[in-house]
Amino acid sequence: MAETALHTPGKNYTFGTVLTAMVTPFKENGEVDYESAAKLATKLVDDGCDGLVVTGTTGETSTLTDEENLGMFKAVKDAVGDRCKVIAGTGTNDTAHSIQLSKRAAEIGVDGLLIVTPYYNKPSQAGIQAHFEAIASATELPVMLYDIPGRAGIAIAPETIIALSKHPKIVALKDAKADYQSTTTVLANTDLDVYSGDDGLTLPLMAAGAVGVVSVTAHVAAAKYRILVDAMLAGDLATARAAHFELDPIQRAVMSHVQGAVAAKHILNWQGVLPNTVVRLPLVAPSETELETIRTDLREGGWEI
């Protein structure tokens, strides 16, 4: 059984412990708003994030060109420098394309790569393993696997993750499949830094040995996640539980009613952080009923909206 990193005093995690999966701001004309992205990244670090995932699912990566992806990586890295880790979402369902984008991201100076399960193709586990290993071998950057079967259409089997953990560049897992037994198996048999990819499961996954969270809700509640994660790493369950329950209505507001990027952009706009709420098709704006439900949850969480 591998030793988990939980409660290790002074442990320096490769990607940090409170990471935001950043939205990609757009201008009213639909172009990427790199200036707003830089300002948002700076705010998130000021609020307590020590890692930022750029152009992942929440960053609407499937609607971005390669040049827009690279522009986002550069804008965020230039804004935050060494204050936090910048992880570039360079995974696609085309291995060769993923390698090309990863190499270009490395040239920009990002700190790591987030590689999602190859979606739509539905490869075998052998194909999934070969895909990840090829990308991880293409640069010197550390890699975080991203297991999200609800979007990819296929899960990474625990046995495949265990095999992948032996690759020297594969050091972390963003676990977004809500399969506690699978996560437990991975934690018990690897030295990967595991991150909750489901905001509401941060506490229970950390109780099993995960080291933090890659969160959408942290756009608007990073300081509270910092309290929760630091408390869990310190073994202070009472403080962590209190933060967990305080976060619950905020998590519902961001994640339960409309797509996370859509909700996050509206809340950030209400806060004055983003100048607009523009998303790219096929995402669309919420209905007024959905917006009011989001506001109701935020009020329950103590917000004045």
Predicted regions and their residues:
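Short helix-capping segments at alpha-helix termini
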Residues: 78-84, 107-109, 139-141, 166-169, ...
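Catalytic alpha/beta core domains of metabolic enzymes, predominantly
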Residues: 134-138, 149-248, 252-256
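C-terminal alpha-helical cap/extension of soluble enzyme domains
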Residues: 3-10, 14-24, 43, 47-49, ...
